[in-house]
Regions:
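Short recognition helix of helix-turn-helix/winged-helix DNA-binding domains
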Residues: 1-99, 106, 126
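Winged-helix/helix-turn-helix nucleic-acid-interaction surface
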Residues: 25, 96-151
């Protein structure tokens, strides 16, 4: 991790902790009024709007974008990268494992994610890949202000 990324993650962890303590009930109430309580029984995922606006700029294909959104749904803790199985992503997306692998390879080749392999003996990850999103976070932080400026012109 770069020092800048650690700072961003530390700041976002601090801000999310402070804001979640202060407004967790308010934001949950807002989400429930928007989506309904039942729709949120499996939780919810926060995704920066910049990612949607930058999909075309970054040339992320629809399949790779879907894979990325599914990875984000598994990113629960700031310092713990998502590690879903490719098979579970394929089932959720109703595509083949190979299609998921192509989407992951695209994101990796673009430099947005870094795949880290684990051993089958690892007590937690059990051979699943860990998907490091550092580059995605840095890209969004670098590109979002520019896209916002362009949109407001």
């Amino acid at each position: 991790h770069s020092a800048k990324m650690k700072g961003i993650l530390k700041d976002s962890l601090h801000l999310s902790t402070v804001s979640s303590v202060m407004s967790e009930k308010n934001s949950l109430a807002a989400l429930e009024s928007k989506w309904g309580k039942s729709a949120l029984t499996m939780g919810w995922t926060a995704v920066p709007s910049a990612l949607f606006f930058l999909q075309g700029t970054l040339s992320i294909s629809p399949v790779a974008f879907n894979v990325l959104l599914n990875l984000l749904a598994h990113w629960w803790k700031v310092y713990e990268w998502p590690h879903p199985s490719q098979e579970s992503l394929a089932i959720r997306m109703s595509v083949s494992v190979r299609t998921v692998q192509r989407g992951l390879a695209e994101l990796e080749n673009m430099g947005l994610i870094t795949r880290r392999k684990t051993s089958k003996e690892h007590p937690k990850y059990k051979g699943r890949n860990i998907y490091d999103l550092t580059n995605l976070v840095e890209s969004l932080n670098n590109l979002a202000p520019n896209i916002k400026d362009k949109l407001s012109q």
